[in-house]
Design a protein with these regions (language model features):
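Sec-dependent bacterial lipoprotein signal peptides
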Residues: 1-20
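Lipid interaction determinants
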Residues: 21-182
């Protein structure tokens, strides 16, 4: 009888130890993460690479660079436009079950370059510089709604990596892969 009691006590102690070691989803996401993702806006493809820092107090900050590629027609000529974008954002984040909800409190976007190419052979046609680039940047930023809350569903979560899924402006799924930096 005494031996059975010791075994039960040992099992209970192990179970208590295991549950004490389990981290919440939010605790696992605290830290700095490097990520890559591809999304679309108005038919253009955007490849994003950035770093987010999720803090224990529920705030976050992030920086990212993106390359947006889209096709249009200018004066009857088909062109491919490649645009470099630099972004900064900060705000609050929470975890609801298996979703990360980010609510920005500040954001900034700058178009760093805008180049035009011939889509048939990839040859360079021209680029915007100076005032033209600033004006194009302002128009692009107005089209974005970066102060809108976003939700990412967690598909996979490991100690040093996680994968999320969300829906972009064109209704397509965005899969982002995050790798722990620290």
């Amino acid at each position: 009888m005494k031996q059975k009691l010791q075994i039960v006590t040992a099992i209970v102690a192990i179970l208590i130890g295991l549950t004490a070691c389990q981290k919440t989803t939010k605790d696992q996401l605290i830290g700095t993460w490097h990520y890559t993702a591809t999304t679309t806006i108005d038919g253009g493809i955007i490849n994003i690479e950035g770093t987010d820092t999720n803090k224990e107090d529920g705030t976050y900050s992030g920086v990212a660079n993106a390359i947006c590629t889209f096709y249009t027609e200018i004066d009857g000529v088909n062109v491919q436009i490649k645009m470099g974008i630099s972004m900064k954002e900060s705000g609050e984040w929470t975890v609801n079950d298996k979703e990360i909800v980010s609510s920005p409190t500040s954001s900034g976007v700058k178009v760093t370059y805008m180049r035009y190419y011939d889509p048939s052979d990839g040859s360079f046609l021209g680029e915007l510089t100076g005032r033209e680039l600033l004006e194009a940047s302002d128009v692009f930023v107005q089209d974005l709604n970066l102060m809108e809350a976003s939700t990412e569903r967690i598909l996979m979560l490991q100690e040093n990596k996680y994968v999320t899924e969300s829906i972009d402006d064109d209704g397509r799924k965005i899969t982002a892969t995050y790798t722990r930096v620290r």
